[in-house]
């Protein structure tokens, strides 16, 4: 994150990264724990190429719904890797503190780092009363699935909800 800044475009309400992401290194370091993967070799160290040691699961039948949302336990890497956010240069550290389970901001403020609150944190966007669970960005864009009865995890695909696709594809 050193030297990287996000500037919000007033017209779109979305942010642009100041410098292109030049590496997958951060995502690969996170993926050693936060991906569904098969181990190929022992001795992975942070900074080493992930694929020299692990084979992460990607879009495989049974792991994702037909629209790309996670179906089974994929540990966030797979869904994030296929997201528009990843494509735009977002990294894990833009939202998460790397050495703990804390987000860089609380609630919708984590999204407002890159998305204009006036446009997106408003009933005209989310169609819910302010402060309600439906008004929380993650409840539409990062739906949660609970694994092993006690472990809720959010889909990191960060998709735009498409109810018509859900109806058509099941």
Where are these regions (language model features)?
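Primarily the internal scaffold of c-type cytochrome electron-transfer domains
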Residues: 1-170
